[in-house]
Structure formats: structure tokens, C-alpha cells
């Protein structure tokens, strides 16, 4: 089941925010934001109140019109990928894409507004030491163990460009399984046992430039 979350600011707490759902959910989600070398470091800590399979996704809206933007995922996507065949990931298929981090040479997504000459990037900070098998390659899948792989990408939210990222991995609207082959989307769920916590960190950077 999918639970839309809202960010609630905290006071007198180690964390800056708590992600809350309208209904009771079996996990607490706290978020801390710090500034490191002019970059915002976002740390999310999930703690299970009972055994739960989870997939966490966060979106950060820019102030960029999606139609004014170019996009970058290292080794996978450049600008709008319109030079790629229609059977490959590109704007021919969709203007919103999220992919497994191991599709990329670096787990980074960049959005550049050509009119404002501004950009925003997100990069995951993690050690990639393990992966887990799943019985299926599409739809909602349960992982057999623990993975290090999350996802990253960009989305069109009502005409506004947004960074999208999360854990464990997800690929949408299609999965690129091999050269010139698009398959249905996949969302992986990992077990978090009662009392266990997982900490996830991403780094957000904003700036100005003439191009990528």
C-alpha cells in the first residue's frame, strides 16, 4: 500500500523534520538537514514499529518549468535523450524517469534550467556493498535480503521539474533491461524488522551556470 507523506517540522528534537501519513503506519521516518561545503545533506532515518516491507521515495521540487529543463544522469541520460531510439529511455516515451543507481556511473541526477541558467543536483552518499535477488523483474517485488541500491531521477510535477530519489530501487515508467528493450516498471521492497533502523543520505546542490 502506498502512503502519501507530509513533512512536519520538529522543535527540541535531534531531527529537523518528521514524515507523517494521514493514517497510522508501521514505521517512523525522521529527516535531518545539514549544510556541508555549500551543499545540503539530507539524512532520512526509518525505524520499524513492526516487521515491514518498505520502499521510500522523496521528491524535491525545483522552481524550474519542466519544459525549460535539460536532465543528466551520468552514463544513462543526457539532456532529453532525444537522439536515442524510441526503444531506449528518452522523452519519446516519457518526460519523467527514475532508475536503479547501478545504471549510472555515479548515483546522481542533475536538472538544468536553460532560461534561468540554474541547476539542482542530488547524489546519494552510500557504500555499495550488497544486492539482493527478487523472484520477479517487474511490478512490486520483494527482495530476498538486503540491498545497497536505491534509485534516482526526475519527474514532471504539474509542469514543475522535480528531483526524485529513494530506497530500495525502483524504475519507472519503464525498466531498461537490455539494449533497445523497455520492460514494465519495477518497485522493490526490503524487509525492516521490528526495532531495526536504516539511515539514508543524499546531498543536494544548487547553483548557476551556462550549461551542464
Identify the residue ranges that each predicted region occupies.
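Short Pro-Gly-centered flexible turn/kink motifs
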Residues: 189-211
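Beta-strand/loop-rich accessory regions of lumenal/periplasmic or secreted enzymes
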Residues: 1-194
Amino acid at each position: 500500500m502506498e502512503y502519501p507523506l507530509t513533512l512536519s517540522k520538529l522543535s527540541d528534537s535531534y531531527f529537523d523534520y518528521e514524515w507523517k501519513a494521514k493514517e497510522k503506519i508501521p514505521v517512523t521516518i525522521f529527516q535531518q538537514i545539514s549544510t556541508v561545503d555549500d551543499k545540503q545533506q539530507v539524512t532520512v532515518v526509518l525505524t520499524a514499529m513492526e516487521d515491514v516491507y518498505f520502499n521510500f521515495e522523496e521528491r524535491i521540487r525545483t522552481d524550474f518549468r519542466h519544459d525549460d529543463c535539460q536532465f543528466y544522469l551520468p552514463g544513462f541520460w543526457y539532456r532529453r535523450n532525444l537522439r536515442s531510439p524510441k526503444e531506449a529511455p528518452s522523452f519519446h516515451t516519457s518526460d519523467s524517469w527514475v532508475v536503479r543507481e547501478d545504471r549510472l556511473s555515479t548515483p546522481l541526477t542533475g536538472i538544468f534550467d536553460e532560461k534561468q541558467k540554474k541547476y539542482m543536483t542530488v547524489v546519494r552518499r552510500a557504500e555499495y556493498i550488497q544486492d539482493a535477488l527478487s523472484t520477479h523483474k517487474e511490478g512490486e517485488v520483494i527482495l530476498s535480503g538486503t540491498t545497497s541500491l536505491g534509485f534516482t531521477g526526475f519527474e514532471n510535477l504539474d509542469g514543475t521539474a522535480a528531483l526524485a530519489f529513494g530506497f530500495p530501487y525502483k524504475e519507472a515508467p519503464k525498466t531498461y533491461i537490455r539494449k533497445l528493450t523497455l520492460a514494465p516498471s519495477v518497485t522493490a521492497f526490503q524487509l525492516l524488522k521490528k526495532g531495526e533502523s536504516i539511515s539514508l543520505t543524499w546531498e543536494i546542490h544548487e547553483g548557476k551556470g551556462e550549461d551542464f
